Amino acid sequence: MKNILKKQIYWRIPLAFSLLTSSCSDYLDKLPENTVEVEGIDYTNKSNMYMPVSGVYATARGYLGSWSSYGCIIVRGDDVNKGGSPTDQIEYEYASKFQYDRLTTFWALSGLWGNCYYVVSTSNSALESLENYAKHLTSESDKQLNAQYAAEVRFFRAYAYFQLVNLFGDVPLLLDNQELNVFKNTKEDVKKYIYDELDYCIANLPAIRPNESEHPGAVTKYTAEMLKAKQKMYDNEWDEVLALTEDIVNSGKFELYNDFYELFKIPGKLCNESLLEYQFTDFGNGSGDIVSSDNWFAFQGPRGEAPISGWAFIEPTEKIRNLFSKRGESVRAETTFLMTDATTRDGDYIPVAQPGEPTAYNGKAYTPANQMTPGRTGYGDNNNIRVFRYADVLLMNAEAKVRKGQNGDAPLNLVRERAGLAPIANATLDQILEERQVELALEWGERFFDLVRTDRATQELPGFVKGESEYYPIPQDQIDLNPNLEAEPVPFEPEVTE
């Protein structure tokens, strides 16, 4: 695909969305509407109380899992090249070189901003619906369930703000979908808001794995703890990182999936390593209804014949490939790098690249043809997008221990053992950070954020300027719609409820 249709999506803050009815009784049982109904509902019928929650899951997987947004998130690390043909979506190349002055009108960056706020807006509406249901509940068990559902929604609102604050810095906290001409809030206030939201989630979500939920894959207490730990890690607050990750580890609920190759493919969907996935399904049918990833997999797929065919973006850099080779990686290399002019163990031939295009692709987005439902031809159909993994929890735990003068060998070596590597004794911080670099390569910009938080970005990323390159600029179309976004951030003043 030489040129991708640019979906010019313009989002205004405030957001005035038309919120229509969601027909989802379970967030994978029917096609998502990506919407939440607020008016015209019988709030006395508690059997429908999960409907607004399912709408938020549908919105999150469609918008937080957007392929164009993912490109903006992942492309700034030294493990990723833009890929694609040399001139296609050249703005991703500018982003990787931190030439932000060339991105102010980039449609995908505006889409990233808007996608996050769409999740916020949908969450706000869902919470309004849940409050209306709560007014008619009498039993404690029903009230507790309502609080759990609210916590599921608030998790995704917190995650949207997690993306916004780490990608853009100072951003508005939108608490009311009717707010007009909002100002930015400080990064510190946004992070505090995220922590407060996640504390509510931790207190009200069940202490189970996502695959143990009544709605399989739903977020749980441990998903919220992991998100909070990640933000605390970015803020170098290691006491809390240790406490949060210890709670997850000591729960005994999670384990590393035994096959790294299959972890990112159909057999690894919602395994015991998973803390968060965006879920998709073809319902086991070769045609007809499908809950699709809307090209997240195709964006990173190789040039080739369907169903192993995509747009050739997101290329592993020579730097990360050399590191894998130097370390003697074989298990993780086979999975992470989908090499051209080669045949995978599942028998899919990956053609030679066109001149100027990638010689390897993101293997973590590869779904073998023999695992797809017969009749389906879309690259990655019926696979899930992995977002949070237990391996990351173990590595955060190991790093927190070492930073606090403790021994982090045990969690680190669990990850290394799965990769077929020898254990390390008395692991150093540098060894743990390199393990993160390899284990989490080509996943959600983890490498970039690790370099920033450890103050190594200037050393490792050509063009990175400390104090300037950490955050994307707010898209110009958003500033045109709301000039207050150019003003200095204001203190956050939460509403006080009596």
What do these predicted regions represent?
Residues 24-75, 245, 475, 486-498:
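Membrane-proximal, proline-rich intrinsically disordered regions
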Residues 46-54, 58-64, 86-168, 180-188, ...:
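Conserved, well-structured interaction surfaces
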Residues 23-25, 86, 116-119, 193, ...:
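Long, intrinsically disordered, low-complexity segments
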Residues 250-358:
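Extended ligand-binding clefts on enzyme/binding-domain cores
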Residues 94-100, 322-389:
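Flexible, polar/acidic helix-loop-strand segments at domain edges
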Residues 39-43, 47, 67-88, 174, ...:
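Short, surface-exposed recognition loops and adjoining beta-strand edges that mediate ligand/DNA contacts
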